[in-house]
Amino acid sequence: MSMLKPSGLKAPTKILKPGSTALKTPAAAAAPLEKTVPSEKASGPPSSETQEEFVDDFRVGERVWVNGNKPGFIQFLGETQFAPGQWAGIVLDEPIGKNDGSVAGVRYFQCEPLKGIFTRPSKLTRKVQAEDEANGLQTAHARAASPLSTAAATMVSSSPATPSNIPQKPSQPVAKETSATPQISNLTKTASESISNLSEAGSVKKGERELKIGDRVLVGGTKAGVVRFLGETDFAKGEWCGVELDEPLGKNDGAVAGTRYFQCQPKYGLFAPVHKVTKIGFPSTTPAKAKAAAVRRVMATTPASLKRSPSASSLSSMSSVASSVSSKPSRTGLLTETSSRYARKISGTTALQEALKEKQQHIEQLLAERDLERAEVAKATSHVGEIEQELALARDGHDQHVLELEAKMDQLRTMVEAADREKVELLNQLEEEKRKVEDLQFRVEEESITKGDLETQTKLEHARIKELEQSLLFEKTKADKLQRELEDTRVATVSEKSRIMELEKDLALRVQEVAELRRRLESSKPPGDVDMSLSLLQEISALQEKLEVTHTDHQNEVTSLKDHFGTREEMFQKEIKALHAATEKLSKENESLRSKLDHANKENSDVIALWKSKLETAIASHQQAMEELKVSFSKGIGTDSAEFAELKTQIERLRLDYQHEIESLQSKQDSERSAHAKEMESMKAKLMKIIKEKEDSLEAVKARLDTAEDQHLVEMEEMLSKLQEAEIKKEKFASASEEAVSTQTSMQDTVNKLHQKEEQFNMLSSELEKLRENLTDMEAKFKEKDEREDQLVKAKEKLENDIAEIMKMSGDNSSQLTKMNDELRLKERSVEELQLKLTKANENASLLQKSIGEVTLKAEQSQQEAAKKHEEEKKELENKLLELEKKMETSHYQCQDLKAKYEKASSETKIKHEEILQNFQKMLVDTEDKLKAAQEANRDLMQDMEELKSQADKAKAAQTAEDAMQIMEQMTKEKTETLASLEDTKQTNAKLQSELDTLKENNLKTVEELNKSKELLNEENQKMEEFKKEIETLKQAAAQKSQQLSALQEENVKLAEELGRTRDEVTSHQKLEEERSVLNNQLLEMKKSLPSNTLRESEYRKDADEEKASLQKSISLTSALLTEKDAELEKLRNEVTVLRGENASAKSLHSVVQTLESDKVKLELKVKNLELQLKENKRQLSSSSGNTDVQTEEDERAQESQQMIDFLNSVIVDLQRKNQDLKMKVEMMSEAALNGNGEDPNSYDSDDQEKQSKKKPRLFCDICDCFDLHDTEDCPTQAQMSEDPPHSTHHGSRSEERPYCEICEMFGHWATNCNDDETF
C-alpha cells in the first residue's frame, strides 16, 4: 500500500522497471485461450466503474476491495494525524495488512494484528477488479502492447484449435492450463511494465500541457485550488504552477523571494512543479480497452496462430475451393449481357430464336460449371474426412507428449513464479524507496522556497533596520541642533540679564545723582530764584516720568523675554524627551529584529541540516536496496538460463519427432488422394446422365421465361432512363452545392479580411489614444507653463507697484542707489539666463509639436488609406453578396424545379409499380386457377383409375390380361404428364414470386433514394438559410465598420482641433514672453531714473529679496523642467538605440531559430531511429535464446539507447524552450515594428515609451543610500543653517503705528501697559 506522506503531497509517478524476459511455452489446449480473451475484455469496464466510485460516499461496515484484490470491511472514515486529507481504515479478511488499527501511537479502530490497513477512499472499489489491475497496474490503463507482451500472448495463444468433429480428451490438462494462464499473464505484465510506463509518462505530459490558468486542480492529491500562474520562476528552474488554495494550507500570498507571480490572501498561495499538479475531472490515462485491443491484435497476428491449421495440404485444398468460387460467373453479369443483346434484336421472330439459342448455351455452361463445383466439393469433403481421422490419431500421440511436457512445465512455472514474486516484491520496495526519495526532494524544494521567502523577509528587515538607523541619525542630528539652539538661547539670556543688571545700576546711580542735585538745590536755593527752582523741578519731574516709563518698558521686555525663554525651554525639553523615547523604541525594535533574524537563521540552518541528514540516509538505503536487487537479479538469471537451456533441448527433440510423423502422414495422404480422384470420375459420369435428363425439363421452362423476361427488360430500361435523368439532376444539384460551398469559403475569406481590418482599426485607435495621452501630457505641461507665466506676471505687477512707491519715496543716497543698481544688474543677468532657458524649452516644445504633427499626419494618412481600403473591400463584398444572392435565387429555382420533376417521376414510378403488381397478381390468380383445375383433373383421373381398376377386375373374367395392361400403361402416362405440368406451373409460380420480391426491393430502394434526395434538399435549404444569415451578419458588420470609420474620422478632426488649440496656446505663450521682455526694459529705464532715498532702503531690500526668492523659485522650476525634458530626450534616444539593437538581434535570433528548428528535426529523427532500434532490441530480447552473455549485451545496448533517447528528449525540450523564447522575442520585435509602421525609428515600442514616461521615478537619496524617503536635493543631512539671520517680514500696513514701550525698549505694547511689578 502506497500511503501519502505527512506533508500531504501526492506520491510520485511510476518509475521505469527493468523488463524481464518472457518464456516461450509449447502449444497448449484451446481452453486457456478462450478464458484469456474475456479477462482482457473485462479489464475495460471496471476502470470506468472505479473512476465513478471514487466520488461515491463509502460507509462504515461496507465490504470493499483495496486496490481491487484485498477484500475487507470499512472500520474508519475521516481525517488522521499521520497525514492530511480523508483516509479509510479497513479490516482485511487475511493478515496481509500493516497494523492493528493504530498508527504512531494513535488508535483509530480495533482489529487483529496485520489485518488493519489505511488507504485513500479513491483506492477502494465495491467489486473485484481484473488480474492485471490486482497486480498493481490499475493506473496504467492506456499502455500500448509492447513486444514483450506480444511474446507472452504468443505463449498463451500457441495451442492448436480442436475441431468440432473430433472427440476431446478428459478435461484434466485443460484445468491445469487454465490455472497456468494467469501466472503467465502476470509474467507478461511484469515484463511489459518497462515499456508501458513510457506511454504513461507521455499521457501525463499531455495532461500537463492541457493545464490552463483558472483550472481546478489538486496539489499532492489533497490540496484543492485554482491555477493562477503557469511558467518559469526565478527561485527555481523548470515549469512551476502557482495555485490559490481553497483553505489556508499554503506557504505564501503569490510572491516568492520578492517577485510576485499572482495575488491572493496570505497562506493561500502554493507553488508546485507541473507534474505534481493534477486537473480535477481530467483522467491522466486512457481507459484499459486500448490495452485489451492491442493484446487481441497481437494474439491475432502471432505466428503461433498459423500453427493451428492441421497441415499444409488442407490449406492448399481450401485455396482451391476459394479459387473455384471466385471463378464462378455472376448471374447479374449474364443478365446484363443478355439484356444488351435483346435490346439490340427485339424486332422480329428471328431475334427471339437467336436469343433462345444463346440462352441455351448459357444454361449449358452453367450446368457444366455446377457439375465441376459439385465434384470439387465432394473431393474436398472426402479429403477433409480422411485428414480429420489422421489428425485425431496424431492428436492422441500429441496429447500424451503434451501431458508429459506440462508436468515439467508446471514445475518450471512454479519456480519462475516464485522468482517473479520475489522480483515484484523487490521492485515494489524499489518504487517505494524512489517515491520516498522524490517526496524528500519535493520537501527540500519546498524548504528552499520557504528559505527564499525567509531570505527576502530578512532582506526587507535589514532594509527596515537601515532605514530606522538613518532615521535615528536624522533624529540625533535634530536633537544636537536643538541642544545647540538651547545653549545659544541660554547664553543670550545670561547676556541680557547682565545688561539688565548694568541698567539697574545706572538707574540707581542716576537716582542718587538726582537726590544729591535736589539737596544741592534746596541748600543753594536763594529766595529770589523761585522761578529757576520751579523750572528745575518741572524738568526733574519730566525726567522722573521718563525714567518711570523706561523702567516700566524695561520690566515688560524682561517679563516677555522670560516667558518666551520659558516656553522655548519647555518646547525643547519636550522635543528632547520625545527624541529619547523614539531612540529607545528604535533601539528596542532593532534588538528584537536582530533576535528574530538570529532565530530564523538558526532555524534555517537546523532545517537544512535535518534535510541533509534525511537525504543522506535515504540515498544510502536506496543504494543498499539497489545493490541487493542487483545481486538477487544476477542469481535469478543464472538459474533461469540453465533451466531454459534444458527446456530448449527437450523442445527441439519433440519438434524433430513431430516432423517425422508429419512426413509419414503426408505420404499416406498422397496415396489416398489418387484413390479419391478415381471415385470422383465415376461420380461425374453418373451426374452427367442426371443433368441430361433435367435439361429436357428446363427447355420448356426457358420458353415461358423468355417472354416474361422481354417484358421485364423493357420496363427495366424505362426505369433506368428515369434513374439516369434523376442522377443528372442530382449531379446538377451537387454542382450547385459545391458552388455554394465555394461561395461560403469566399465569404469566410472576406470575414477573415474584415477581422484583419478590425485589428488594423484597433491598432490605429490605440495609436490615436496614445497620441491623445501625449496631447494631454503636453496640455498639462502648457498649463504648468501658464501658471508659471501668471506667477511671473504677478511678480512683475508687484515690482511695478514697488517701483512706483520707490519713485514716490525716493531719497538722496547715491551709494544705496549704486548698490541697488548692482543688485538689479545681477537680477537682469539671472533673468537673461532664464530667458535663454525658456527659449530652449520653447524650441523643445516646438520640436515636440512638430513630432506630434508628423505623427498625427501619419495617423491621418494611415487612417485614410485604411478607410479607402475598407470602402473598396466593402464594395467588393457588396458585389460578391449581390452575385451570391443571384446564385442563391437561381439555385433556389433549380431546387424547386428539381423537386417538381422528382415528385412527377416518383408518382409515375409508383403508378407503373402498381400496374406491374396488379399484372403479377392477375398472373398469380391465373396460375392458381390453373393449379386448381389441374388438381381437379388429377382427382378425376384418380377416380377414373379406380373405376378402371374395378372394371379391370370385372373384365378379368371376360377380357384378357394384355388389354388391361395396355389401359394401365396409358393411364400412368397421362398421370406423369399431369404431374410434370403441375411441377412446371409450380416453378413458374416460384419464379414469378421471386421477380415480385426483386421488384419490391427495387421499389424500396427507389423510395429510400427519394427520401435521401429529400433530406439532401432540406439540408441544402438549411445551408441556403445559413448563407442568408451570414450575409446579413456581414452586412451588419460592414455597417458597424463604416460607423467605426466615421467615429474615427470625427475623433481625428477633434484631435486636429485640439492640435490647433495647443498651437494657439504656444503662440500666446510666446507673446507673454515678449511682453515680459518689454516690461524688463521698462524696469531698466525706471531704475535709471530712480532718485536716492535713505528711509525706504530696508523695505526696498526686502522687496528685492522677495523678488530674488520668487525668481529663484521660478528658475529652479524651469531648470527642473529642463532637466526633466533632457532626461526624457535622453531616454527616447536610448530607447531608439536599444530598439535598433533589438531589431538587429531579432534578425540574428530569427536565423538562430531556423538553425534550432533544423537541429530539432534532426534530433527528432535520431530519437525515432533510436526508438526503432530499442523496439528491435526488445523484440530480439523476447525471441532470443537464454544465453546470458547475449542478454547482458542487449540489456546494456537497450539501456544505452534509452539513455540516448532521454538525453535527446531533454535536448529537444531545451531547444523547444529556447525556440519559444526566441519566437516570443521575434514577435515582440515585429509587433514593435508594426506599431511604428516601420518608418520612424523613434516610433518603435511606443507603448514602452509611454509606460516609461508615465511611471514616476522612485525617490532615492545618494547620501543616505535609501529609497522612497526623500531625494538627494531634499536630504536633511546636507541642509545647512544660514549664517546671516533672516530678514524680518511683518507684512503689516505701513500707515499703521506699531506699539512701542519706552520702558522695556521693545515693540509689542505701549508704556502704559507695561508691568511695573517685576523685580530685578
Swiss-Prot record:
Modified residues (Phosphothreonine): T50, T181
Low complexity bias spans: 21-35, 301-331
Domain CAP-Gly: 78-120, 231-273
PTM (free text): Phosphorylated. Phosphorylation induces conformational changes by increasing the affinity of the N-terminus for C-terminus, resulting in inhibition of its function thus decreasing its binding to microtubules and DCTN1. Exhibits a folded, autoinhibited conformation when phosphorylated and an open conformation when dephosphorylated with increased binding affinity to microtubules and DCTN1. Phosphorylation regulates its recruitment to tyrosinated microtubules and the recruitment of vesicular cargo to microtubules in neurons.
Keywords tagged on the record: Cell projection, Coiled coil, Cytoplasm, Cytoplasmic vesicle, Cytoskeleton, Membrane, Metal-binding, Microtubule, Phosphoprotein, Repeat, Transport, Zinc, Zinc-finger
Subunit structure, as described in the record: Interacts with MTOR; phosphorylates and regulates CLIP1. Interacts (via CAP-Gly domains) with tubulin and TUBA1B. Interacts with SLAIN2. Interacts with MAPRE1 and MAPRE3. Interacts (via zinc finger) with DCTN1. Binds preferentially to tyrosinated microtubules, and only marginally to detyrosinated microtubules.
Organism: Rattus norvegicus
Any Gene Ontology CC annotation: nuclear envelope
Main location: cytoplasm
Residues recorded as bearing Phosphoserine in the entry: S48, S146, S194, S196, S199, S203, S309, S311, S314, S347, S1116, S1246
Effect annotated for changing S313E: Phosphomimetic mutant which exhibits a closed autoinhibited conformation with a low affinity for microtubules and DCTN1
Protein name listed in UniProt: CAP-Gly domain-containing linker protein 1
Region of interest (Disordered), ranges: 1-53, 156-181, 301-338, 1089-1109, 1178-1201
Polar residues bias: start-end ranges: 156-171, 1180-1190
Membrane topology of the entry: Peripheral membrane protein
ZnF (CCHC-type) residues: 1299-1316
Described purpose of this protein according to its UniProt entry: Binds to the plus end of microtubules and regulates the dynamics of the microtubule cytoskeleton. Promotes microtubule growth and microtubule bundling. Links cytoplasmic vesicles to microtubules and thereby plays an important role in intracellular vesicle trafficking. Plays a role macropinocytosis and endosome trafficking.
Cellular localization per UniProt: Cytoplasm; Cytoplasm, Cytoskeleton; Cytoplasmic vesicle membrane; Cell projection, Ruffle
GO-annotated biological processes: cytoplasmic microtubule organization; microtubule bundle formation; positive regulation of dendrite development; positive regulation of microtubule polymerization; protein transport into plasma membrane raft
Biased composition (Basic and acidic residues): 1096-1109
Annotated phenotype, changing S309A: Phosphodeficient mutant which exhibits an open conformation with a high affinity for microtubules and DCTN1
Domain notes: Intramolecular interaction between the zinc finger domain and the CAP-Gly domains may inhibit interaction with tubulin.
